[in-house]
């Protein structure tokens, strides 16, 4: 594998311990990337790198260009200042050594495709290689294919229904009672032997991961190719950065040094106003403010095309259990109300002063009391409500009474 001439490394490259000396000839990064790494083992590896790490700051004009492009793609809220500088440095190196004539100034439109599977159904199973084997369509007596549904309107339910029971044994018993011809045991053994041989032929070498096909399987799972004639690339594991790079026309490298042709991830799409966001931590829509965000799988190809895969499964947008009565709003310092809007204000729920005090005998203003130990607060309002520092502004934990809850929980 020919190394890339210029590689811009993100923090994910150092955290994943990527062999950058084998991936690129010249390794670039910014000082903010090294500063934000807090892992002790990673910082220990950074002290003894087997290659020269070059620090270079991007020009303000490229930072401004990348910022405007990320706002158009919708990834700007998910990018930090360090991420934008890494993207700008990649764009700057591409402009210096290759040119900007092939780069895009506007993101392409989103293409929509539907699927009968659930959006969270795994596309690949880790540890198993399941190659696709095309099967010829079986013709029925009417001349129609048996694998195609007669009505496409109900095709989405075929994936979720339970398999039909096998009634061959009961039919054979009815034929024996009526005295009709039943196939002999020898014929059944011949048919079973033919099926066994067919199954054995399917199992030979199919579905197993071997040293001969491990490279092919890794490329299929990661949608990666060998980087050929690539002079500038960015090695990152962040999907928002990969999305911006691919839509701009820049090259994205994986941790193993392969060239990423397609990036797969999930985004949140509001089914009320149809706006999307890549910030998976959001609960309410940033455009309309409703709690109508749903997870949608997306793929970004190497030409910058963004595909959103919607599901025709009716269970994805099931309105069951969404209508329920809300409790009466309560006031006060320790009120716990349901979280209904994003800008809703909650009480601070702080601990009492007695619970927050600490004993420091070496403090200059320390006053010796009856006991040198900290008193345990058990009588204040916050202590009786079991308020902790981790629950600041958490609101009502279980908003929907129709939601499932754990049983057999140990009581305090």
Curated annotation (Swiss-Prot):
Single GO term (MF): zinc ion binding
One GO term of the biological process aspect: maturation of SSU-rRNA
Main location, first listed in the record: nucleus
Residues noted as binding Zn(2+) in the record, renumbered to the chain: 270, 273, 285, 288
EC number: 3.1.-.-
A single Gene Ontology CC term: nucleoplasm
Localization terms from the record: Nucleus
The entry's keywords: Endonuclease, Hydrolase, Metal-binding, Nuclease, Nucleus, Phosphoprotein, Zinc, Zinc-finger
UniProt-listed InterPro entries: NOB1, Nob1_euk, NOB1_Zf-like_sf, NOB1_Zn-bd, PIN_dom, Ribonuclease_PIN, WRNPLPNID
Biased segments, Acidic residues type: 182-193
Modified sites of kind Phosphoserine: 184, 201, 325, 352
SMART domains according to UniProt: PINc
Zn finger spans (NOB1): 260-332
Segments forming domain PINc: 5-108
Keyword Zinc: yes
Annotated segments matching region Disordered: 180-208
Gene3D superfamilies cross-referenced by the UniProt entry: 5'-nuclease, Nin one binding (NOB1), Zn-ribbon-like
Tissues/organs with expression: Detected in liver, lung, placenta, endothelial cells and spleen.
Signal peptide: none
Function comment: May play a role in mRNA degradation. Endonuclease required for processing of 20S pre-rRNA precursor and biogenesis of 40S ribosomal subunits.
Complex and partners: Interacts with UPF2. Component of the small ribosomal subunit, ribosomal RNA processing complex (SSU RRP complex).
Name listed for the protein in its UniProt record: RNA-binding protein NOB1
Organism, as annotated: Homo sapiens
Encoding gene per record: NOB1
């Amino acid at each position: 594998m020919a190394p890339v001439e210029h590689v811009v490394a993100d923090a994910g490259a150092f955290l994943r311990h990527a062999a950058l000396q084998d991936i690129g000839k010249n390794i670039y990064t910014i000082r903010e990337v090294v500063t934000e790494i807090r892992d002790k083992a990673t910082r220990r590896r950074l002290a003894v790198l087997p290659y020269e790490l070059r620090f270079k700051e991007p020009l303000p004009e490229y930072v401004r260009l990348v910022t405007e492009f990320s706002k158009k793609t919708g990834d700007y809220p998910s990018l930090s200042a360090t991420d934008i500088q890494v993207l700008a440095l990649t764009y700057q190196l591409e402009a210096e050594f290759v040119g900007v004539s092939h780069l895009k100034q506007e993101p392409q439109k989103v293409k929509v495709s539907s699927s009968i599977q659930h959006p969270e159904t795994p596309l690949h199973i880790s540890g198993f290689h399941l190659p696709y084997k095309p099967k010829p369509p079986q013709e029925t007596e009417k001349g129609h294919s048996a694998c195609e549904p007669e009505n496409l309107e109900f095709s989405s339910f075929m994936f979720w229904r339970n398999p039909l029971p096998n009634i061959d044994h009961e039919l054979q018993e009815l034929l024996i009672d009526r005295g009709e011809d039943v196939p002999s045991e020898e014929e059944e053994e011949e048919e079973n032997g033919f099926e066994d041989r067919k199954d054995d032929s399917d199992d030979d070498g199919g579905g197993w991961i071997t040293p001969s096909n491990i490279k092919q399987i890794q490329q299929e799972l990661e949608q990666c190719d060998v980087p050929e004639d690539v002079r500038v690339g960015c090695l990152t594991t962040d999907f928002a950065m990969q999305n911006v790079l691919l839509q701009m026309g820049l090259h994205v490298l994986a941790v193993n040094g392969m060239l990423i042709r397609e990036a797969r991830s999930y985004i949140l799409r509001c089914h009320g106003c149809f706006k999307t966001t890549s910030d998976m931590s959001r609960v309410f829509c940033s455009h309309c403010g409703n709690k109508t965000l749903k997870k949608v799988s997306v793929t970004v190809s190497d030409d910058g095309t963004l595909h959103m895969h919607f599901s025709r499964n009716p269970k994805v947008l099931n309105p069951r259990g969404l209508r329920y009565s809300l409790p009466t709003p309560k006031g006060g310092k320790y009120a716990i109300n349901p979280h209904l809007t994003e800008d809703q204000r909650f009480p601070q729920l702080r601990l009492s002063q007695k619970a927050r005090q600490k004993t420091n005998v070496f403090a200059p203003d320390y006053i010796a009391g009856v006991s040198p130990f900290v008193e345990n607060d058990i009588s204040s309002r916050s202590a009786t409500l079991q308020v902790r520092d981790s629950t600041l502004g958490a609101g009502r934990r279980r908003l929907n009474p129709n939601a499932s809850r754990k049983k057999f929980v140990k009581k305090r």
